[in-house]
């Protein structure tokens, strides 16, 4: 153990991934994973599981050598999925056009005013009216959380920001749609703003608890948190935009796969098999696929950028039940495998009985599955069950039922992969190159990570008849991904050359007398502003800046095209700091 105290490279990265079943922690020194820990996630109080994982992974290490801590957490995801978010008063400025009564999570409060597609304020929102309405609405709701979103607010955030100033006298937390996303799509921005305010209280408490836990262990390194788009940012900054930390589990998986260097350039299906679910992601030419416009939060489409990841209800602790003469595997999880002291048999128990896993008590797992086999035989003898072509008629022993359990799990995973591939191959084509040279996704390679990867991964490869890779440290891939995540921020600059107007919605900036005339000039300005913002946040200013999108439209007036509408979106390139050995 003493040898661990002398670490090559001097500085270490600590990664934490709070999953639905397990909380993982890793320490990375240079390009080596030098310590790992896996502890059960304590849903009633996440900090208990986080504390246990920290204590386990830090044993024998000098915490003063930790350079950065990066966390991937389910706290926001759980709040949203379980519908436990706080009440939010949602204010919208829609102007004419589409009826939005039924597309938001709550009934919005409509405010007078209108900004057109060029960013021209056609009708101002009266300040005194906002104050009066806010007092009345807040008295009824009793909440101190609000969200504000205006149609075409990304073209001119003036109305959103002025309304926010008026609401500060009434509400403690206010989110703006245009500050969260610079992209056109009023409904998505509005939904993001609503959920951003709704999860702020729980995120703020969680942030304080994590900071206290690190402080108690003498960890003074900067604390970052992973975002759904695979980037990380300082926890302090994310207090104003916690909705972006939802669904970070898939992001951690994707980054972990990148860091482990196992994807290659083939069409690859990556599986992260946890205790409850299997996350499926597709990779083309070494890059993961992203959602087109943003991730859906419950049934509501948001502006939060995310990797395209789909989950199916199969995990190591998927419960096994006999229902109406049928054997089901998942999607529910009720606790640990019987081999680990649980009360109902799981997929993990089946893997233990078949010799694919060697944890826990084999005898307990075998006895539980034998009891299930006996129950199946008793059910088949009932006159109420149709035994024709029923697989259950062959079940006699614990091994028989274990094989059937694994087969059903593999069928569910295969179906999930087929559906994801089908959706990908039906995506709309936007450029001529994709018509001339279509890149149809045909799986060529499977990569499996997650706690159940070593136990189920080989069977998946055999079942799908594809080569399968299970990397070293597959069980803690998500924590590795979190530890190595690069910082990312995204900015949008919109320039109207006729009006000499420059707008940066994410920063709430509106500048008159802009002299930029060409797209190349706007790109350079965007890079300059992004570098300045990165410096302000204490990020690595040497990191590559990526131009995500350029839109350049001529403005035709009097049969002449003299002016332009130019929109440029840039970001610090997402990815990992380096590979691990």
Regions found by a protein language model. Give the residues of each.
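N-terminally biased helix-coil "hinge/interface" segments that flank
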Residues: 4-581
């Amino acid at each position: 153990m003493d040898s661990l105290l002398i670490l090559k490279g001097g500085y270490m990265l600590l990664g934490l991934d709070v999953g639905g079943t397990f909380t993982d922690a890793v320490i990375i020194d240079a390009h080596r994973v030098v310590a790992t820990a896996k502890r059960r996630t304590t849903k009633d109080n996440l900090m208990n599981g986080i504390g246990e994982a920290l204590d386990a992974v830090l044993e024998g290490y000098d915490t003063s050598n930790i350079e950065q801590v990066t966390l991937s957490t389910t706290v926001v995801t759980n709040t949203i999925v379980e519908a436990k978010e706080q009440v939010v008063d949602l204010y919208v400025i829609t102007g004419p056009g589409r009826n939005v009564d039924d597309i938001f999570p709550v009934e919005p409060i409509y405010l007078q005013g209108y900004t057109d597609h060029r960013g021209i304020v056609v009708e101002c929102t009266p300040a005194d009216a906002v104050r009066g309405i806010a007092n009345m609405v807040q008295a009824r709701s009793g909440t101190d959380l609000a969200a504000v979103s205006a149609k075409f607010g990304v073209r001119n955030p003036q109305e959103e920001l002025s309304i926010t100033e008026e609401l500060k006298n009434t509400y403690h937390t206010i989110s703006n749609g245009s500050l969260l996303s610079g992209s056109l799509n009023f409904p998505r921005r509005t939904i993001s703003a609503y959920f951003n305010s709704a999860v702020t209280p729980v995120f703020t408490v969680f942030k304080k608890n994590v900071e206290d836990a690190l402080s108690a262990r003498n960890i003074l390194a900067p604390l970052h948190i992973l975002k759904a788009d695979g980037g990380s940012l300082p926890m302090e900054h994310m207090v104003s935009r916690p909705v972006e930390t939802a669904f970070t589990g898939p992001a951690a998986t994707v980054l972990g796969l990148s860091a482990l260097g196992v994807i290659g350039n083939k069409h690859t299906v990556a599986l992260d098999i946890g205790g409850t679910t299997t996350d499926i992601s597709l990779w083309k030419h070494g890059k993961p696929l992203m959602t087109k416009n943003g991730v859906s939060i419950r049934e509501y489409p948001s502006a939060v950028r995310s990797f395209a990841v789909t989950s199916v209800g199969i995990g190591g602790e998927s419960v096994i039940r006999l229902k109406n003469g049928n054997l089901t595997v998942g999607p529910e999880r009720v606790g640990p495998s019987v081999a680990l002291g649980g009360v109902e048999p799981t997929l993990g128990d089946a893997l233990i009985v078949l010799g694919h896993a060697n944890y826990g008590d084999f005898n307990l797992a075998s006895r539980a599955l034998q009891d299930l086999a006996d129950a199946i035989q008793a059910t088949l003898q009932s006159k109420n069950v149709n035994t024709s072509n029923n697989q259950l008629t062959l079940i006699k022993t614990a091994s028989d039922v274990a094989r059937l359990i694994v087969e059903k799990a593999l069928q569910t995973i295969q179906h999930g992969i087929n559906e994801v591939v089908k959706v990908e191959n039906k995506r709309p084509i936007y450029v001529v190159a994709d018509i001339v040279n279509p890149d149809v996704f045909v799986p060529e390679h499977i990569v499996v990570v997650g706690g159940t990867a070593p136990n189920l991964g080989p069977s998946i490869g055999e079942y799908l008849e594809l080569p399968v890779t299970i990397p070293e440290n597959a069980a803690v891939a998500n924590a590795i991904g979190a530890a190595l995540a690069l910082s990312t921020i995204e900015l949008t600059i919109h320039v109207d050359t006729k009006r000499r107007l420059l707008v940066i919605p994410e920063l709430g900036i509106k500048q008159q007398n802009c002299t930029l005339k060409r797209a190349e000039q706007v790109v350079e300005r965007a890079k300059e502003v992004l570098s300045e913002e990165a410096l302000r946040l204490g990020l690595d200013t040497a990191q590559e800046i990526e131009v995500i999108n350029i839109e350049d439209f001529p403005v035709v007036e009097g049969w002449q095209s003299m002016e332009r509408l130019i929109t440029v979106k840039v970001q610090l390139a997402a990815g990992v700091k380096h590979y691990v050995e």
